[in-house]
């Protein structure tokens, strides 16, 4: 694509007024070695159009929410009707009740739910609630699992599974993260070791049931069921962070696929239909501790605002129609199968996998197991960057990081998928010349 000048100009201007020129670091494209990101002018269906009028097949979908595609007619109509009645009330509204009822109907282990404004707020609030409910302070998270930018989550593993968390962002005091313990995803022994050392101090385990912030890593060997058992044995809570996987890999989230019951679940992305939203919910006994029903404080000026609630209601109505996830999953499977076949044809070290409307791309042989954050770091990250650049220049917009999952929408056509596969095939053949 030749037309890049307006994005370059805007990025230079943005850096004068916005730190780094973006409002979320990954958008800068630095992690994939690009000089500037593409500034988007508008979006429709499966496509993004940038300020230079380049068209892209979009496999980010605003990082997951756009499961129906951009500017779905029914969602837009619902929002437009609500806009005429007000943007935000700072008071309860019927839409909050309707969306809560729909979530509880569809998610197997949520009895009550509280709305917030982002996934970070949801996970932060769930941790506070778990600590209050158990009367304990320590939490366990997993290396490579991202739960938002609250201080207690910005932790690296240190040396060894038993190391206390050390902050990996300036501005996070060590005292804030001293109660954050870090284990290795899919390594149940690292969890057992932490409980042996801190048995009566651990309030909860928080985990992405499918790790979508280290590409797309699935739980192995009944890992989630084993976490459930350990939490039960030690009177700790199990929190599933389904901000990404909720209503994305299946209608009932990853917990419905693996049939493991968390005590609390965090949600976001899809439940807002593209509007800013988050939620946390779970057993009524626990949720009744949240203010004003109980003593655990949580509040938000725009929480439960009618615009986000309306978008969420319409989105969940549409994705809960019979056959929706069969069709969505078939699209993702066609993409993944085509990419894998193309790589195999050229004996290229690459494999892809998917579940529901979510997929992962790995630049290594399919004979190499990628089950942990460390495993992912051993894949060919440089080759991913080259692949990203080639696909972007040819009109395919992938996540600008080898550590991020991709998303497909119901709006993606067979032609979109076939074009993507064809371009990947060209890349694989070119790299072997």
UniProtKB/Swiss-Prot annotation:
CDD domains assigned to the protein according to its UniProt record, in alphabetical order: OAT_like
Annotated catalysed reactions: (S)-4-amino-5-oxopentanoate = 5-aminolevulinate
GO BP terms: protoporphyrinogen IX biosynthetic process
First-level EC class: isomerase
Principal location: cytoplasm
N6-(pyridoxal phosphate)lysine modification, residue list: 269
Gene3D superfamilies per UniProt: Aspartate Aminotransferase, domain 1 (3.90.1150.10), Type I PLP-dependent aspartate aminotransferase-like (Major domain) (3.40.640.10)
Pathway: Porphyrin-containing compound metabolism; protoporphyrin-IX biosynthesis; 5-aminolevulinate from L-glutamyl-tRNA(Glu): step 2/2
Family (UniProt): Belongs to the class-III pyridoxal-phosphate-dependent aminotransferase family. HemL subfamily.
The protein, known as: Glutamate-1-semialdehyde 2,1-aminomutase
Biological classification of the source: Bacteria, Pseudomonadati, Pseudomonadota, Gammaproteobacteria, Thiotrichales
């Amino acid at each position: 694509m030749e037309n890049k000048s307006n994005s370059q100009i805007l990025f230079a201007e943005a850096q004068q007024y916005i730190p780094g020129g973006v409002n979320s670091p990954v958008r800068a494209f630095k992690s994939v070695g690009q000089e500037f990101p593409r500034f988007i002018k508008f979006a429709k269906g499966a496509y993004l159009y940038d300020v230079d009028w380049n068209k892209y097949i979009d496999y980010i979908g605003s990082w997951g929410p756009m499961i129906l595609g951009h500017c779905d007619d029914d969602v837009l109509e619902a929002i437009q009707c609500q806009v005429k009645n007000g943007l935000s009330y700072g008071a309860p509204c019927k839409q909050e009740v309707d969306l809560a009822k729909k979530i509880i109907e569809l998610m197997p282990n949520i009895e009550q739910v509280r709305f917030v404004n982002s996934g970070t707020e949801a996970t932060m609030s769930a941790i506070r609630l778990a600590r209050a409910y158990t009367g304990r302070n320590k939490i366990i998270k997993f290396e490579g699992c991202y739960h938002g930018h609250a201080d207690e989550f910005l932790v690296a593993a240190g040396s060894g599974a038993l190391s206390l968390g050390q902050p990996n962002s300036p501005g996070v005091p060590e005292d804030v993260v001293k109660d954050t313990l870090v284990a290795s995803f899919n390594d149940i022994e690292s969890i057992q070791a932490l409980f042996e050392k801190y048995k009566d101090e651990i309030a909860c385990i928080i985990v992405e049931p499918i790790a979508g912030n280290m590409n797309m890593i699935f739980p192995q060997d009944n890992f989630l069921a084993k976490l459930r058992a350990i939490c039960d044995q030690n009177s700790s809570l199990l929190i599933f962070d389904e901000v990404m996987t909720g209503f994305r890999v299946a209608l009932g989230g990853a917990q419905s696929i693996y049939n493991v019951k968390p005590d609390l679940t965090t949600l976001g992305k899809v439940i807002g239909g593209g509007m800013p939203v988050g939620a946390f919910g779970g057993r009524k006994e626990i949720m009744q501790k949240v203010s004003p029903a109980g003593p655990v404080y949580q509040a938000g000026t725009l929480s439960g605002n009618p615009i986000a609630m309306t978008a969420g209601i319409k989105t969940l109505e549409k994705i809960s129609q019979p056959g929706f996830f069969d069709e969505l999953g078939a699209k993702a499977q066609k993409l993944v199968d085509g990419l894998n076949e193309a790589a195999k044809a050229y004996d290229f070290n690459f494999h892809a996998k998917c579940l529901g409307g979510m997929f992962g791309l790995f630049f290594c042989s399919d004979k190499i197991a990628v089950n942990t954050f460390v495993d992912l770091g051993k894949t060919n990250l440089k080759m991913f960057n080259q692949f990203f650049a080639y696909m972007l220049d040819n009109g395919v917009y992938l996540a600008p990081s080898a550590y991020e999952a991709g998303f497909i929408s119901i709006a993606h056509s067979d032609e979109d998928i076939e074009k993507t596969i064809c371009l990947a095939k060209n890349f694989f053949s070119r790299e072997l010349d």
